[in-house]
């Protein structure tokens, strides 16, 4: 197993145009898949009217995207309220960020900063928590700042078990900072 994995890690470190990354010898006992569905089939599609599809990541975990000729943008994901878990909050990425940008070529870089913002109504926050604050806010917002830096470092053929794919290789550096605002 180690020799196979080590060989495959060496394969994916190659950069530049015209590469062949051969990971066809990798095997495992688990099969996973991702199902893309229309937003109207999601429990929270109404929160993301501009979405073109969503991915259900299990249970009520849904992630909404918009796809057009510029690429695929992440719009957000609803989540249970931190204060009242029975309430679902709209987790919105501001501005929407590219998961995939098109066209993209070897040497291209993409640097983005996005904010996942969850507005929390003060009415659902217990007074015992609000009374500990120096001022009484009229609203609260959870803000998660994420910086995405992508570089397209290679292109070629990815040989997988059972099928080959034409691919672009990316290196991604992602940094996240969380804070609450009143």
Locate predicted features.
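Conserved functional acidic sites
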Residues: 1-182
């Amino acid at each position: 197993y180690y020799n196979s994995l080590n060989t495959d890690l060496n394969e994916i470190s190659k950069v530049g145009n015209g590469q062949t990354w051969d990971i066809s010898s990798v095997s495992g006992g688990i099969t996973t898949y991702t199902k893309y569905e229309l937003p109207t089939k999601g429990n929270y599609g109404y929160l993301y009217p501009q979405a073109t599809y969503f991915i259900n990541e299990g249970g009520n975990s849904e992630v909404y995207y918009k796809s057009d000729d510029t690429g695929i943008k992440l719009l957000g994901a609803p989540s249970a309220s931190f204060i009242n878990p029975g309430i679902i909050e709209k987790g919105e990425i501001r501005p929407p960020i590219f998961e995939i940008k098109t066209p993209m070529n070897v040497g291209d870089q993409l640097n983005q900063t996005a904010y996942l913002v969850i507005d929390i109504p003060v009415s659902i926050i217990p007074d015992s928590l609000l009374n500990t604050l120096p001022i009484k806010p009229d609203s609260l917002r959870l803000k998660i700042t994420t910086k995405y830096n992508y570089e397209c470092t290679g292109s070629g053929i990815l040989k997988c078990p059972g099928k080959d794919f034409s691919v672009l290789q990316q290196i991604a550096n992602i940094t996240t900072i969380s804070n609450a605002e009143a």
